[in-house]
């Protein structure tokens, strides 16, 4: 982490090139009295007072509640102690580094592409142009005091890692898909890459609001590549009758990753998320969905967790209005010494009549040393619904393995075929 919203540098007294800290050290610093007392004197406090209010409220909440623990339902099975034991390399700011700009210069040869790096937004040339119904970006360079002050009010404190991510984010960004764009960004999807600017074990954070305005149809291809520590807090606002499709791929390149995704679904909106993940030394991927009336939500995950990697997930959907549809279908495959967990919760209020929900989580262990947990939680307060769930953990079917080997298929290839069949 190089900067926070209201601090020019973080842990500057520990910013030696060869010194390491952990996540608790960073949280302790940004919630210290000295840090909070300096907020009124910061640059952005005068320009965007609402930012200061939101940021300070987040810090005070973080100071009171601290980092998430296993006592919280969503982290009951997560090996959260492994996350807190990760060493993070202290580093001075690279915010204006030519090397960083050069690292992402490949965008010049792409179209409909965005890179998010430590709250910086880099775009391909076509998205950087001002034209009717093009994407609008509000960041520390392209500012609009009134609009940004309204958007930042959406960043409310939640019982997860989003508070930490926001506290360590240099600047919260907003990416707007205007209603007049219709299905322009659906026919030609937008690629959103989450990247580290270094392969060193530093930590970089992004807090981003994606606003899909009414009647707009948007397709995002999200590519998360973790070469170092990365924390992402992304909020997706689906306005009335908006449609959003996300295809997210997360690959391990030696780092670790926390990704909190919050979806605010207005009436008549449609959300589809398809994702894959390999896990990492620690990965936490959470989805929080707040559904208004007549919404449709599909969350489909197919994850192959690599040897020794950690992958933990919490999916929460809240429905307080009628006629909502939901399908959560997540399958995990764990290789040797992998550790995974899934906790899914439906919270259906008394006014959410005709809710139609299906929650499935299937897990396949490829080795006896794999650890996999799964738990569905249904909190239903109305009888006028249709809801079903199924969560399982199983081993490779030896009968299927024997059959394939009897046909001349070697054991490794047979295992790969069974995994591919499981994840299809």
Give the ranges of each region predicted by the language model.
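Short, low-to-moderate order helix/coil transition modules at the start of elongated helical scaffolds
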Residues: 2-243, 249-250, 254
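Serine/proline-rich low-complexity intrinsically disordered segments, especially terminal tails, linkers
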Residues: 11, 34, 271, 297-298, ...
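Catalytic-core signal marking the mid-to-C-terminal active-site face
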Residues: 49, 415-420
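Small-residue helix-packing motif on alpha-helices
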Residues: 62, 414-415
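A local structural micro-motif
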Residues: 70, 411-413
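Conserved beta-strand/loop scaffold segments within soluble protein domains that form the structured core
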Residues: 134, 138, 143-409, 420-424
């Amino acid at each position: 982490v190089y900067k926070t919203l209201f601090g020019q540098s973080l842990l500057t007294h520990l910013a030696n090139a060869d010194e390491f800290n952990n996540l608790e050290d960073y949280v302790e610093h940004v919630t210290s009295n000295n840090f909070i007392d300096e907020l009124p004197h910061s640059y952005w406090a005068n320009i965007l007072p609402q930012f200061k209010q939101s940021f300070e409220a987040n810090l005070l909440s973080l100071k009171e509640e601290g980092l998430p623990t296993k006592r919280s339902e969503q982290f009951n099975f997560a090996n959260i102690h492994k996350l807190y034991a990760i060493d993070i390399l202290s580093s001075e700011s690279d915010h204006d580094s030519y090397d960083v700009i050069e690292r992402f210069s490949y965008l010049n040869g792409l179209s409909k592409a965005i890179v998010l790096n430590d709250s910086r937004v880099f775009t391909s040339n076509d998205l950087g142009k001002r034209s009717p119904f093009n994407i609008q970006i509000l960041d520390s360079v392209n500012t609009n005091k009134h609009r940004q002050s309204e958007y930042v009010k959406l960043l409310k404190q939640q019982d997860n890692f989003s508070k930490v991510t926001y506290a360590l984010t240099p600047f919260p960004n907003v990416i707007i898909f205007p209603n007049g764009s219709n299905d322009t960004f659906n026919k030609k999807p937008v690629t959103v890459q989450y990247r580290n600017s270094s392969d060193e074990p530093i930590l970089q954070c992004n807090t981003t609001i994606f606003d899909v305005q009414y009647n707009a149809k948007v397709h995002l291809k999200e590519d998360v590549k973790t070469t170092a520590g990365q924390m992402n807090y992304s909020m997706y606002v689906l306005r009335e009758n908006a449609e959003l499709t996300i295809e997210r791929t997360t690959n391990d390149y030696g780092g670790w990753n926390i990704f909190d995704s919050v979806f605010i679904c207005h009436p008549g909106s449609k959300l589809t998320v398809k994702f894959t993940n390999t896990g990492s030394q620690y990965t936490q991927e959470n989805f929080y969905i707040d559904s208004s009336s007549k919404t449709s939500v599909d969350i489909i995950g197919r994850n192959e967790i690599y040897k020794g990697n950690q992958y933990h997930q919490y999916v929460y959907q809240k429905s307080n209005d009628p006629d909502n549809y939901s399908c959560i279908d997540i399958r995990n495959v764990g290789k040797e010494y992998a550790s995974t967990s899934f906790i899914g919760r439906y919270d259906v209020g008394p006014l959410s009549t005709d809710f139609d929900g299906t929650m499935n989580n299937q897990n396949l262990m490829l080795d006896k040393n794999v650890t996999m947990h799964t738990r569905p939680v249904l909190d239903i307060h109305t009888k006028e619904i249709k809801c079903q769930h199924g969560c399982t953990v199983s081993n490779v079917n030896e009968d299927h393995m024997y059959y394939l080997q009897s046909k001349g298929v070697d054991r490794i290839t047979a295992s790969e075929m069974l995994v591919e069949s499981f994840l299809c």
